[in-house]
């Protein structure tokens, strides 16, 4: 990555049904990478990259990170895991802040909290967090959900569309609040 030594990555997860979840419950994750973000939610900064996908619960499938069920929590943890994997492929990044609306996922990922559920996925995400921390300064910050924060809303859009198995709207046609 050229020109960016400080990045903000917004992560989110989405789930079709968050009660009685199973391995077949649809869930999706998304993240967007922002350079020059002020953190105030007004959309400052440039979108450098974005990724999204479905939560993989089949332990034999490519992309499985340890999730056993599709849920909002496994989607949030998956978003962080994929963001960390992306960070590990980038050169020149000195500082990265992972911003998300799930305090649970941020604190599990960074090791502040111990996982009581989703242990396999939590262990994988914690391992990625530790590995990433060896290469750059990494921290997590909580942002309020569904409060019009542009980049958090974009991550929500990406996750929701992945869960629905639909393509996200291109940034130029998307507005905060659009799912």
Protein language model regions, located:
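Acidic two-metal-ion nuclease catalytic site recognized across multiple nuclease folds
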Residues: 166-179
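RNase H catalytic domain
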Residues: 15-20, 62-66, 80-160, 171-172
């Amino acid at each position: 990555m050229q020109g960016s030594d400080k990045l903000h990555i917004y992560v989110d997860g989405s789930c079709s049904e968050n009660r009685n979840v199973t391995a077949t419950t649809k869930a999706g994750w998304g993240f967007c990478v922002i350079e020059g973000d002020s953190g105030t939610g007004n959309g400052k900064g440039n979108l450098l990259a974005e990724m999204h996908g479905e939560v993989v619960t089949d332990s034999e499938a490519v992309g499985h990170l340890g999730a056993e069920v599709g849920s909002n929590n496994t989607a949030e943890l998956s978003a962080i895991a994929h963001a960390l994997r992306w960070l590990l492929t980038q050169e020149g990044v000195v500082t990265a802040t992972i911003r998300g609306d799930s305090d649970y996922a941020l604190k599990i990922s960074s090791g502040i909290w111990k996982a009581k559920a989703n242990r396999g996925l939590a262990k994988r995400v914690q391992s990625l967090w530790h590995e990433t921390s060896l290469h750059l300064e990494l921290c997590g910050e909580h942002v309020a959900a569904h409060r019009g924060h542009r980049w958090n809303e974009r991550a929500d859009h990406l996750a929701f569309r992945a869960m629905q198995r639909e393509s996200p709207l291109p940034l130029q046609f998307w507005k905060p609040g659009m799912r």
